[in-house]
Swiss-Prot record:
This is 2-C-methyl-D-erythritol 2,4-cyclodiphosphate synthase. Its cofactor is a divalent metal cation. A divalent metal cation binds at D9, H11, H48. Homotrimer. 4-CDP-2-C-methyl-D-erythritol 2-phosphate binds at residues 9-11, 40-41, 65-67, 70-74, 141-144, 148, 151. It is an enzyme of class 4 (lyase).
Length: 168
């Protein structure tokens, strides 16, 4: 059986109070940026969207979205790496008998520019999902300066995942 899941996430971004080197974490990769993400965890919108896509595809009772498993009201998730969230969810879907066929992620932002980091992002996501890099696509787009992304008020990501049930 094949299953498909879709995920979306958004976080506010803001100029840091102190000047200096800042980064935004995207797909588990630190990308230099003049903005910081306002979030409870590390704010990796791409991995958060991926977690929701994985959970949506697997339809595991009691764990159908990121907020159920890792609520932002729980202090134990404050500053937590989103890679941990993906690893935990991969364990859940593997226990449920699923493997990942492929994942496609789109990051929507005016900043940072991610072209030079895409290959590293693909590899990081592939490693987290226990698949080959060729099974992962990461791309970015802007909104042509429209909306909150265009005004550099936030960053968003979409993810779609295909799973195959290999055992009951």
């Amino acid at each position: 059986m094949y299953r498909v899941g879709f995920g979306y996430d958004v976080h506010k971004i803001d100029k840091p109070v102190k000047t200096g080197n800042t980064c935004i974490v995207l797909c588990g990769v630190s990308v230099p940026c003049e903005y910081k993400v306002i979030a409870h965890s590390d704010g990796d919108v791409a991995l958060h969207a991926l977690v929701d896509a994985l959970l949506g595809a697997a339809c595991i009772e009691g764990a159908n979205d990121i907020g159920m498993l890792f609520p932002d009201t729980d202090e134990k998730w404050r500053g937590k790496s989103s890679s941990y969230f993906v690893e935990h969810v991969v364990t859940l879907i593997q226990r449920a008998g699923y493997v990942v066929n492929n994942a496609d992620l789109t990051i929507v932002c005016e900043t940072p520019r991610i072209q030079q980091y895409k290959s590293e992002m693909q590899q990081q996501v592939a490693d987290l999902l226990c698949v080959r890099k060729e099974q992962i696509n990461v791309k970015a787009t802007t909104t042509e300066k429209l909306g909150f992304e265009g005004r550099k008020e936030g960053i968003a990501a979409y993810a779609i995942v295909s799973l195959t049930k290999i055992r009951p």
